[in-house]
Amino acid sequence: MTQSQLIGIIAMSVIFVLLLILAYCSNNYSLNGIKSKKIGDGQHGTARFATKSEVKHTYNQVLFNVENWRKGRYLPTVQGTVVGCKSHGKQTIALVDEGDVHTLMIGAAGVGKTAFFLYPNIEFACASGMSFLQTDTKGDVFRNYGSIAKKYYDYNVSVLDLRNPTRSDENNILHLVNKYMDIYLSDKHNLSAKAKAEKYAKITAKTIISIGGGDAAAYGANAFFYDAAEGLLASLILLLAEFGEKNERHIVSVFKMIQDLLEPVREKQSVKKTAPKSGFKALMERLPDEHKAKWLAGSALHSADQAMLSVMSTALSRLNSFIDSEMEQILCFGTALDAEKFCKEKSAIFIVLPEEDVSKYFMVSLIIQQLYREILVIADENGGRLPNRVMFYCDEFGTFPKIEGAEAMFSASRSRRISIIAIIQSFAQLNKNYGKEGQEIITDNTQLTIFGGFAPNSQSAEVLSKALGEQTVLSGSVSHGKEKSQSLQMIGRPLLTVDELKSMPKGQFIVMKTGTHPMISPLKLYFKWGISFEEPYILEDKGARTVTYMSKEALMREVEIQYPQMKKTVSEEDEELEEETPKRRKIPRTGGV
């Protein structure tokens, strides 16, 4: 047998063996051989993750160089939200969304929302010059970043520590009313300042009345009392700003004045005894007819006595929340940082929530509401957009009480260059505070959603798995009867199943953005970004400072001095005429049906 014949026989044998193996395998179907790979043309879903080129096109890539930033070098020229990162050698490249968007971050307690996400974002905000507000339950963020923001980035820093009010900066919520009233009083021709004082007085009154939640529609038949109470509050805030001493012009003085004005007074000019009138009506009678405070209080002033008392009681009930000796140390003095300074200069406001005292949580809602409304006024003065982007880092957004009008904030603020980053632990928190419709409005207006690190029993993981969508994958079945067979088909499979979401490693998050495919985004611990902390930012203990209030008598005296022509004297004839007014005679019944 020649060598060529031998080679041919061997080749034929090999082919025969391969055919036998192929025949065996074709009849030995296994379920393990069916892989869930992407197939088809999107018949059951087109969900997929973004490609590298799509990520590069969607997000700005910024070198995250903390060392140089803190020296004032190579500061970023873009502003926005840090949503992810990638490593390039020893350098870290941040993925930044520079759009006017709101962000919703969802993650269970302990997944690293602060260490992985919040700290890099605050560092970037400081480096890019964005003013920001940050809520903090532990106080760690302001202690770590207060000094850095002030020392390296030249920020105005204000800490409102509701846990330790004597170690807190002041926040007089009437500050802007007082400021513009002083400008107007120094120049009576400056009507713009007067109008701003009136506008901020109405904003403050509306914010206070809405502390309890609801609006005119929710109050139903009682809507009149709440609307009238709002006008009454605005009226007294204006009067306090106009006539009060500098250290008396605060919200607790308003409470005291309303309480005092409930008491009846008798005019000293009366010759004979007459029925006493309420202190509130006596005060309003001393004002000129064209005084705006009198107009604002018109609903209450022209109501029946009982209705007017109900209006004043409604206002008092809303102000009860401010009656706290510790809170007075924050509310009754100056203001470290107002809305105008916050928008025009690099500024940071840290609000510390006491986890052990939920009775003070309303202040967070109040501060955010008032600051937001005042920012809108500033934006309108600048053509509808702020000159510099403002960030609200609302950590524990689902923990503190409902922010009245939060749905409108998420809907309307984006176009004004206000970005809200709401950090929650689950959708159930939003549902509890804002209801099903409120939750949907908030989630529908957050163009960025970042999530990861779910608890084993998390229901939010199911919601987000569904939100990621489905992809078309291969599936099939195998039969091992008399004749072995296999069938293949296309099915829809979630892009990430619930168990895959729950088993994601710490530091890995999913980022979804409107109009783009989602991406798996790794985030590093803050020290791997190059972030280091220095000495903690601590405010000095100011001690218990004496609080002064404006009294009803002082206010009436100042009004009489300013408007002496409004003093009224009641003549003896007028009083006699009032007393001798004939009573309605009762007509006797004479019969009939």
Language model features: what each stretch is:
Residues M1-V111, A115-E123, S128, T166, ...:
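Basic- and hydrophobic-enriched, low-structure N-terminal and domain-boundary segments
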Residues N32-K37, D41, K150-Y152, I173-M181, ...:
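Low-complexity, intrinsically disordered or weakly predicted helical/coil tracts enriched
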Residues N68-R70, F362, F397, A455:
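A short glycine-/small-residue-rich loop at the edge of a beta-strand within enzyme catalytic domains
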Residues F410-I510:
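Conserved ATP-driven motor cores of ASCE-family P-loop NTPases powering translocation/secretion/packaging/pilus
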Residues K524:
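Short, surface-exposed polybasic-aromatic patches that bind anionic ligands, especially phosphate groups
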